[in-house]
Swiss-Prot record:
This is Rootletin. Major structural component of the ciliary rootlet, a cytoskeletal-like structure in ciliated cells which originates from the basal body at the proximal end of a cilium and extends proximally toward the cell nucleus. Required for cilia integrity and function in sensory neurons. Maintains cilia integrity, partly by modulating the assembly and transport of intraflagellar proteins along the ciliary axoneme. Required for normal mating behavior and normal responses to environmental and chemical stimuli. Belongs to the rootletin family. Expressed in head ciliated neurons. Residues 326-341, 396-451, 907-931, 961-982, 989-998 have a biased composition (Basic and acidic residues). It is found in: Cytoplasm, Cytoskeleton, Cilium basal body; Cytoplasm, Cytoskeleton, Cilium axoneme. Pfam families: Rootletin. Residues 29-58, 162-223, 284-1303, 1368-1579, 1607-1863 form a coiled coil. Signal peptide: none annotated. The keyword Cell membrane does not apply.
């Protein structure tokens, strides 16, 4: 109602405004008419004046001139008129200047002047708003007839004038009346405007109410969604209760089956005497047992396959999660960079504004200075011109600054939007975490389900055990019955059945022997398997321990990676760079030692070059001393060049200041990065804690496994079953691990789900395809499940202990989950704190931005333009929406076609899979034998590998000790480098220029690092996949690990080489800098002596050539670095080849021999690398011993690895055939199963991703709604501004009118009433208006004739100049146009409000639709997850059999992964080093450029030296002093050079001696090794000697000699080591001395440079005046440059504005699309509600079906009773048979007494009859067994039918959804036609399922329920039991269920009749 009232108010406002317009138009017309009237009056007045003038002239001519005193006495009223009188009328001013005599009442003139001033003051100041109306004072200065009497004494003319004046005043009164009416109209307009403002306020209140209603609707939607969720949970509970009831029915059925088994045992006991039949039964039982065993084997194989598939799928998911995590990190880093960049831009803009303000201040100062310094010759016009120029320039600058401020404001708005997006993203993150918690709850629920299923499985296992025990009892009873039958036959007919008994005995003995042999074989096999399992478990425990150690190594490697990333960041700063490089060098001390050797070689070369250069310096100095007399002119030129250099240094200092500012910014960024790294480290600590808990759980699991082994010893026959249970337990543990990993990865999955809305349709189509694939998979899995259930009936497993273990595991899981939740809460708190801090920072920034925003103008105009653009974009989006709808329809049709194709292909694939499974099951049995042999071999290999691992651990301990030594050495290097830092301080100024490039390169390096991390993760995922494929080839993997270790050594060698090259480059850079200093000195000397001789120029060219040679050397060094990099690339390529070989091992095992040859070649290459390392190690003094030990150890390892390679080659030859067969057979079946299961889980994951995307889209839509609300608020603000403007205009009008009225109504002073003359003070009035400025300069005239002439001229001039009526018209027109503009603005704003309200409504609808779609998708996801859980539960039961034979292989996989992770880390190291090399190359190039620039600048400076010769004569003495000091310094330098040369020579000698010593040491070590071998031989011989000494007592002199030789060799070795240590100390001491001398040289050079600087300062004092002039010129140039830069920046900002507008348009399009999707979601919500109602009906139907199933159960109970009756009759018959047997025995005894032959024949006949009767009983027994089996099958068939029925209903619901979606787009008749199609399709599906159900019921019910027919007359017929049909649509809501059931009953009756 309020919204309707507000719209009516808006309409009323528009109507009122139109009425106001009409009134204003009428007023304007009336004013026009008044103007015409006033013009006529003016014409008449002019005529009257002419007449009055003529008459006055005639009157003066007739009468004499009056005396002054008489005129004063006759006209006493004119005494106050000194000069002028004033008459002001509407559009009329009469100026009559009158010249009065000086004697006329001069006493009154001051009073009159005061009065005039007072009136003028009132007209100007007293009235606040001066009117521009043409109407003057009504009663003031009016020309009355009394005034006219002074002009004419006659009465006739005066009467005419009076009549004209009366008419004129009447018209003037009418004019005033009209003006008063206009004021009333304006007051009316004001009131209407107030009403409009009130209406706008009402509209604003309505808008707030609408927003509240919107919030209420959202809350209602939320409550509805919660209600739907509760209904879903209720529905799930109902289904679970139904499932439980079905399980209870199954239990009852099993109980009935047990009773039947008991009946079977009773019948078996009754038929104990029949020997032959029981033998047949025994054979049949044996066959059945064999068949069951075969089925068990097949089932185990299937379980293994499925378990492998599931494991592969989980690993694939982990890989995808890691990739998603890396992508999310990249996005977060990009966002952080964008924020930083925007902050930098804002800061730059502020700095620019500050600079502009400074420039403006400077300009103002310049203007003042120019004004102050201006001489007297300048005119004020010149000054004004200059000021105008300055003002124009300032205005231009102000405009530019305003534009820049606008751009800054836009950027600020952009930053605000980004902040809002960030806050929204964080809100989404919180929601995602909440959803994760819900997912965790669902997982807990799934775990509970798994527990229930385990309990059910345990119950089933117990039942199966009972059945098996009954079967064993049966077999025992059969054996007892056989024995008893033999005894009875011996008693009955010993004589007649001797042969028969012997044959039976032979058969029994053979059978028993076979059974015993089988039992013994099985027991032996079980014992072997038990021992093997124990070995495997031990190995697995050991491998797990190794795995833990490897995990620790992996963590250490990760920490190393983090340290190296920090090192990359440390390259940004200079001193921090060096310190952090030292930390890295401490970790890589071995590599640094290798680098020092090459550095020394380079130092020697550079020393030689230095000696040559110094010789040349000496020559140059000699030339300088010779040319000092000629160097005066050169010195003057030199001073000029120094002045220029000073200017350059000033510029450099400014640049350095800028660089320092940037460094400060970089430090701030580094601080933020460190905070983030701290946060990351906290996360890592939490992950480490989780791993620790995981390891504790594994320890407890190992304890439980030990208990299980103890239980295995007690139960010998069920070891295999317990192993399967252990596998289940391992799978549960792995699932728990996967859940823990998912906890870490799930937090970052949500960032992948922020995609565009356009992908929604495609995802929906993919979901439908996925559902079809899942259905096919479900059918296959159901078939497998049915097979498993039928086969599990024959098995039995005791799992009571497992239940206890599972309960303990649950407790552990609960504890771990609680800890995980606590950690999550901590993380949330930390994130909230960080968010609060960020918000505070951003709020401060926003406050600053808002302060800047206050100065911005013309914002309203831009908003209006934006609104117009938005309306246009809205229209475009509507058109695109229509097009998208049409495209959507086409895509749906194409999707349906694709579905049909996919279904056909799935059917074909299912058929192929069935065939492949059969073949694979046959070949699997054949491979098991070969696999067992391979397992034994692998166990032996594992033992050997464990020994190798122990050896490697010992080596690692030795390497760690070496690392500690290297750390100490690195500390020494730190001290040395600190000394080097003192020299580096001078280089900081040059490097500050390079920091810009370094920052850019750092950003590139960060990006490269992120890319490398992504590549590393991808490689890790590929490596994991490859390791899965190579799980069987453990021997090959071990071989590859050995190769990888060698590769690591080679990589370390390459890294050391790269570090050496880096150090060389650093030394070359230091040398280059030294050479730069020397070149600076030389250049100065050459600049002084350039004009002297040509020889100097030639030598200068030679020096340039030397510099070029040095540059060439640098290039060569770069080439060397490039070559090393290429070698690294080649190594990486070789590594990739290794990975390819690993993958080819699974497909091409035959090529392993060739690959092994390649690996041998690669090992030789690695051996060469090791030799190079040995050669490099010889150059080191301190670490010679450690490195030699390492080399010997590495050689041993290499030999061992070669031996292992050869052994593994031989092993591969044995394993090759088995794995080839296995690969070819298992490839197809496993790939098919993997693809299906992967596709199913991928589709489920995609569904979840789409759900989260929808949620993110909802969040974006809400953001857009908030933005539109802000826009609505902006529009309200605009309305307020327009209203304020309107009020101002109205106030102006009112003030104008008031001023006009006041000007008319202000009466004249009291003295005017006494005026009776025609003298008017016109000039004063003119001066009040602004006509006569020089009113005081009016001359005094002596005659009245002259006065009248002047008065007529002035009067005409005033009439021509003053046209006030035109100004009033202009103002009214302006007011009219302004009012029209305001009305148009008001109308536009009202339209915009209405549009905004419509958009709000539409978006609310879209939000509701989207929420419904999300709920639907969530339901689908829940359904998919339930199906997935069911599939996983089934698959877990199938996976457990597959993992028994592959536990050892999987434990090996972890080791391989760790090794490959190390490889990846090494690759990252290589890439980092490559990046460092590239960075150093760039720095060298920059240095070359700087050298070239410096040379050019110096050449230019030398050209300008000859200008100022005269100014440098006074400084010659100071130069002479400086030259003397320089000569002294040069002498000192020469001495130091000589000392350095001597030191270098000594070093060379020492190095030669060291090399000789190293050679001797190597020779001695070789001798030591030989001696050790000889000692070992001697020790062996000693043992033999000792044995011989006991017999022969020979002397042991040879032994003593060997001991003495050994001691001698040890002493010599100790002496050599001491010598080595002494030499190393001496070398260190010499190096320290050399460095000290170099420092001294550097100090001397610095002193010389300081003296030169002093000279330059002295010269600079003379050039100060010139610099001031040049500075002013530079200031002008800089000003121009700043203007150009500002303009360029303005252009850039305009471009950015265009880009932002384009982005806004894109966002608007997206918002429009989201609106359309919202509408679709609303429609889907309605459909889902309908579907919910349909599902409720379906639930009711299922309950009815449940009742029917209960009826069927009752009928089965009736059947059971009938079977019990039949069994009772059978028992009676058995009793009768016993009686007959007793009678027959009595008869036989009688007949034997009577007659032997007759009795024999009779007994034979009776025996045959008994056998026939026993056969009939056996057939009846078989029929009963078949009936029971048929009932089991019937129950499974019912279950399948129910599942198919549910599937049918789902398909029907999906079909109805599709058709309804199509029906929404289609028209009325199309809807009806589709409804018919829908009913036809539904009827077709019903008929199809009806036919299926009928066929199934015919085949099951008619074939399985058979009659019991006996051969004799006494066999009663058992009546058939008509079970009710089980149809897929037997509920009340189905179509024609009653008729179909009747039809099925008739057909079943017909089938019975046919039987």
């Amino acid at each position: 109602m309020k919204s309707a009232a507000s719209s009516e108010d808006v309409v009323r406002v528009t109507e009122d405004l139109s009425e106001c317009r009409n009134r204003l138009d009428a007023g304007i017309e009336e004013n026009r008419r008044n103007r015409q009237v006033i013009q006529d009056i003016n014409d008449q007045l002019q005529r009257f004046r002419q007449r009055a003038n003529a008459e006055s002239i005639e009157s003066f001519n007739l009468t004499p001139s009056p005396d002054v005193t008489l005129s004063s006495l006759a006209h006493p009223g004119l005494t106050h008129l000194h000069n002028q009188t004033n008459i002001s009328m509407p559009s009329l001013t009469i100026d009559i200047p009158l010249n009065s005599n000086a004697m006329i009442s001069s006493s009154r003139t001051p009073n009159y002047a005061i009065n005039g001033l007072r009136n003028r003051h009132k007209s100007l100041v007293g009235h606040r708003y001066r009117s521009t109306s043409p109407i003057g004072d009504y009663g003031r200065h009016r020309s009355s007839p009394r005034v006219l009497a002074h002009y004419n004494l006659d009465g006739a003319d005066i009467g005419v004038g009076e009549e004209n004046l009366d008419e004129l005043f009447a018209k003037l009164k009418e004019e005033l009346f009209k003006n008063n009416t206009l004021e009333e109209v304006n007051e009316m307009l004001r009131e209407e405007n107030d009403a409009a403002l009130a209406a706008n306020e009402h509209l604003r209140v309505d808008a707030t109410n609408l927003s509240r209603q919107l919030q209420q609707l959202q809350q209602q939607q939320h409550t509805e969604s919660m209600r739907f969720r509760s209904e879903n949970t209720r529905y799930r509970n109902q289904t679970e209760t139904q499932h439980r009831k079905l399980i209870s029915l199954w239990k009852e059925f099993t109980a009935v089956k047990r009773q039947l088994h008991e009946l079977r045992t009773t019948t078996a006991n009754d038929l104990d005497r029949q020997l032959t039949e029981f033998t047949r039964c025994a054979t049949l039982m044996r066959k059945a047992i064999r068949h069951a065993e075969q089925k068990n084997l097949d089932q185990k194989e299937q379980m293994k396959r499925e378990k492998d598939d599931v494991l592969d799928e989980t690993l694939r998911q982990l890989n995808s999660v890691t990739e998603n995590y890396m992508k999310s990190e990249e996005k977060a880093n990009e966002r952080q960079r964008d924020l930083k960049r925007k902050e930098d831009e804002c800061r730059k803009l502020r700095e620019q504004n500050d600079e502009l303000s400074d420039i403006l201040e400077q300009l103002s100062k310049m203007a003042h200075e120019m004004a102050g310094g201006r001489g007297r010759n300048e005119t004020p016009m010149d000054v004004a011109r200059k000021m105008r120029k300055l003002l124009t320039t300032k205005n231009g600058e102000i405009d530019e600054s305003r534009e820049a401020a606008k751009q800054a404001e836009k950027e600020r708005d952009r930053a605000k939007k980004d902040l809002e997006k960030e806050e929204k993203r964080r809100k989404d993150d919180r929601e995602a975490e909440r959803k994760r918690s819900s997912v965790y709850s669902q997982r807990e629920h799934d775990l509970k389900k798994l527990d229930d299923e385990l309990r059910k499985a345990s119950e089933k296992i117990r039942n199966l055990e009972e059945q098996r025990e009954s079967q064993e009892k049966l077999t025992i009873s059969v054996q007892n019955s056989l024995n008893e039958a033999h005894r009875q036959h011996k008693q009955f007919i010993e004589e007649l059945m001797i042969r028969h008994r012997e044959e039976l005995k032979e058969r029994e003995d053979s059978h028993e022997e076979a059974l015993r042999s089988k039992d013994t074989e099985e027991r032996s096999r079980f014992e072997k398997e038990r021992s093997e399992r124990e070995k495997i478990r031990r190995e697995s425990d050991e491998l797990r321990e190794t795995q833990r150690s490897l995990k620790g190594d992996v963590a250490a490697m990760k920490t190393d990676l983090d340290d190296k990333t920090l090192r990359l960041d440390m390259l940004e700063t200079e001193r921090d760079e060096l310190k952090k490089k030292l930390e890295t060098e401490r970790e890589q001390a071995d590599q640094r030692d290798l680098e020092i050797a090459e550095c020394r070689a380079k130092l020697d070369e550079m020393a030689e070059k230095e000696a040559e250069l110094r010789k040349e310096l000496a020559e140059f100095q000699a030339i300088i001393t010779a040319m000092e007399g000629e160097g005066k002119l050169n010195q003057e030129q030199f001073l000029e060049s120094k002045n220029e250099l000073n200017t350059l240094t000033d510029q450099i200092e400014s640049l350095n200041s800028e660089v320092e500012n940037k460094n400060e910014e970089i430090r701030n960024l580094m601080a933020t990065l460190q905070e983030k790294e701290v946060h990351i480290q906290n996360v890592r600590t939490s992950s480490h804690q989780l791993t620790a808990t995981y390891e504790e759980a594994n320890g407890e699991i190992d304890i439980l496994k030990a208990e299980l082994t103890r239980l295995h010893e007690q139960v010998n026959e069920r070891t295999r079953q317990i192993s399967e249970a252990n596998e289940k337990y391992d799978d549960a543990a792995r699932k728990n691990d996967a859940l823990l990993e998912d906890v870490a990865t799930w937090q970052e999955k949500y960032e992948q789900l922020k995609m565009e809305l356009e992908e929604m349709n495609r995802r929906g189509q993919e979901k439908e395809r996925e559902e079809a694939d899942l259905r096919a998979l479900l059918d296959d899995l159901r078939g497998n499940f049915d097979k498993l259930t039928n086969e599990l009936k024959q098995k039995g497993v005791t799992v009571d202990s497992l239940n206890e273990e599972i309960s303990s595991l649950k407790e552990q899981l609960n504890k771990s989950e609680k800890e995980r939740k606590e950690e999550l809460l901590r993380m949330e708190e930390l994130e909230q704190k960080n968010e609060a801090e960020m918000k505070e920072e951003y709020e401060v920034k926003l406050q600053l931005a808002e302060k800047d925003r206050q100065g911005v103008e013309n914002f309203g105009k831009e908003c209006e333009a934006r609104m117009n653009e938005l309306t246009k974009i809205h229209e475009m989006l509507m058109e695109e929406h229509d097009q998208l709808k049409v495209d959507h329809l086409h895509t749906e049709e194409e999707v349906e076609r694709l579905k049909e194709k996919m279904r056909k292909e799935l059917e074909k694939l299912n058929e192929q899979n069935d065939g492949d499974r059969a073949e694979w099951s046959n070949e699997r049995n054949r491979l098991e034998s070969s696999k067992n042999e391979a397992v034994t071999e692998l166990q032996e290999r594992v033992q050997k590998l464990e020994d190798v691992v122990k050896e490697k651990e010992d080596k690692e301990i030795a390497l760690r000790r070496d690392l500690e030594d290297s750390h100490e050495k690195s500390r020494d290097l730190d001290d040395k480098l600190r000394k080097m830092e003192l020299t580096d301080e001078e280089k900081e100024e040059d490097r500050k220029k390079e920091q810009k490039t370094l920052n850019e390169e750092r950003m590139k390096l960060m990006e490269q690092k992120e890319e490398a991390m992504l590549v590393a993760t991808k490689h890790a995922t590929t490596i994991d996949q490859q390791t899965r494929r190579i799980s069987v080839l453990e021997g090959d993997v071990e071989k590859l690990t050995a190769g990888i270790a060698e590769r690591e050594s080679s990589i370390n060698a390459l890294e050391s080489n790269t570090m050496e090259l880096i150090s060389k480059l650093e030394t070359t850079e230091a040398e280059l800098e030294k050479l730069k200093d020397e070149l600076a000195v030389m250049l100065k000397q050459n600049s002084e002596l350039k004009n002297g001789k040509e020889g100097l120029s030639e030598k200068w060219n030679e020096e340039r050539k030397k510099i070029q040679d040095l540059a060439d050397q640098l290039r060569e060094a770069n080439k060397v670095v490039h070559n090393m990099r290429m070698k690294n690339v080649n190594l990486e390529e070789k590594k990739n080849e290794l990975d390819q070989n690993v993958t080819d091992l699974t497909n091409k095992v035959r090529q392993l021999e060739i690959q092994l040859m390649d690996k041998a070649a690669k090992n030789e290459v690695s051996g060469d690398l090791l030799r190079k390392m040995e050669h490099d190690a010889q150059s080191m003094l301190k670490q010679a011993q450690n490195e030699q030990f390492r080399l010997t150890d590495l050689e041993k390892v290499r030999k061992a690895l070669q031996d292992e390679n050869q052994r593994l080659v031989n092993d591969l030859a044995t394993v090759k055939a088995a794995f080839e067969v296995k690969r070819e057979t298992s490839k197809s079946a496993i790939s098919d199963i993997l693809d299906k299961y992967r596709s199913a889980e991928e589709k489920a994951n995609k569904g979840e991703l789409d759900n989260q995307r929808l949620r993110s889209d909802l969040a974006t839509v809400t953001l857009k709604l908030e933005r539109q609300e802000l826009k609505a608020k902006d529009s309200d603000n605009r309305l307020r501004d327009s209203q304020k403007r309107f009020e101002e205009v109205q106030s102006k009008l009112a003030n104008l009118q008031k001023s006009a009225v006041e000007s008319l109504q202000n009466p004249m002073s009291s003295n005017s009433r006494q005026n009776r003359s025609i003298y008017v003070d016109i000039p004063r009035a003119a001066s009040s208006i602004g006509l006569n400025e020089n009113s005081d300069e009016v001359p005094l005239r002596s005659s009245p004739s002259v006065r009248f002439a002047d008065s007529s001229q002035n009067m005409q001039r005033a009439v021509d100049s003053m046209d006030v009526s035109s100004s009033v018209g202009v103002t009214l027109r302006f007011l009219k146009e302004r009012i029209e503009q305001l009305e148009a603005d008001n109308a536009d704003l009202s339209d915009a409000l209405e549009k905004a309200k419509d958009e709000l409504r539409q978006r609310n609808e879209k939000l509701a639709d989207r929420q419904m779609v999300i709920e639907r998708v969530e339901r689908q996801l829940v359904h998919i997850t339930e199906e997935r859980n069911t599939i996983e539960n089934r698959m877990t039961s199938q996976r457990q059999m597959y993992l028994t034979n592959e536990e050892s292989s999987r434990s090996r996989e972890h080791e391989i992964r760790s090794m490959k992770a190390r490889i990846s880390t090494l690759e990252l190291h290589l890439r980092e080093k490559e990046s460092k090399l590239a960075h150093l190359r760039k720095e060298i190039e920059v240095l070359h450029g700087q050298l070239h620039d410096a040379l050019e600048s110096k050449e230019k400076a030398t050209g300008l030296v000859g200008v100022q010769d005269s100014k440098h004569r006074d400084l010659e003495e100071q130069l002479d002093r400086a030259n003397r000091e320089r000569e002294l310094a040069i002498g000192k330098q020469r001495r130091t050079l000589a000392e350095n040369e001597n030191l270098f020579r000594k070093l060379e000698q020492l190095e030669k001696e060291r090399e000789q010593l190293m050679r001797e040491i190597t020779d001695e070590r070789r001798l030591n090794e030989r001696n050790r071998t000889s000692l070992e031989e001697l020790r062996v011989s000693e043992r033999t000697w000792k044995s011989a000494m006991t017999t022969a007592k020979k002397p042991a002199e040879e032994q003593e000699r060997a001991v003495q030789e050994q001691r001698r060799w040890e002493e010599s070795n100790h002496e050599m080591t001491n010598r080595n240590t002494a030499l190393t100390k001496e070398c260190d001491r010499l190096r320290v001395e050399m460095r000290d001398q170099l420092n001294r040289m550097n100090g001397i050079n610095l002193r010389s440079v300081d003296f030169e600087r002093k000279n330059e300062e002295l010269s600079s004092k003379l050039i100060v005046m010139q610099n001031t002039v040049t500075a002013m010129k530079k200031f002008e140039e800089e000003w121009k440059r700043l203007e150009a830069e500002m303009r360029a920046e303005l252009k850039i900002l305009r471009k950015e504005k265009l880009m932002q507008t384009a982005e806004i348009e894109d966002l608007k399009r997206k918002s429009f699309r989201s609106d359309t999707e919202k509408k679709e979601i609303e429609g889907i919500r309605v459909r889902l509600e309908r579907e919910i109602s349909a599902l409720k009906r379906h639930v009711d139907a299922l309950e009815e079906e449940k009742g029917k199933t209960e009826k069927a159960v009752r009928e089965t109970m009736n059947e059971r009773r009938a079977i019990d009756k039949s069994l009772a009759s059978m028992e009676r018959e058995n009793q009768q048979l016993y009686r007959n047997c007793a009678q027959l025995q009595a008869q036989i005894q009688n007949l034997e007494r009577d007659a032997g032959n007759r009795s024999v024949t009779k007994l034979a006949k009776e025996h045959s009859l008994l056998e026939a009767r026993i056969a009939a009983l056996i057939e009846e027994k078989r029929q009963l067994q078949s009936m029971l089996d048929q009932k089991d099958a019937n129950y499974s068939h019912k279950r399948k039918l129910l599942e198919s029925q549910i599937q049918l209903l789902r398909e029907q619901l999906e079909a109805e959804r599709r058709k309804r979606t199509k029906g929404v787009v289609a028209t009325g008749p199309t809807v009806s036609r589709r409804g018919v199609q829908h009913t036809s399709a539904f009827r077709h599906t019903i008929e199809r399922h009806r036919s299926l159900s009928q066929s199934s019921e015919r085949t099951i019910l008619q074939e399985r329920y058979l009659e019991y027919v006996y051969t004799g007359d006494r066999t009663p017929a058992i009546q058939m039991i008509n079970t009710p049909p089980i149809s897929p649509l037997s509920h009340s809501g189905s179509f024609n269920s009653d008729g179909r059931e009747a039809r099925i009953r008739r057909e079943s009756d017909n089938g019975h009749l046919q039987h």
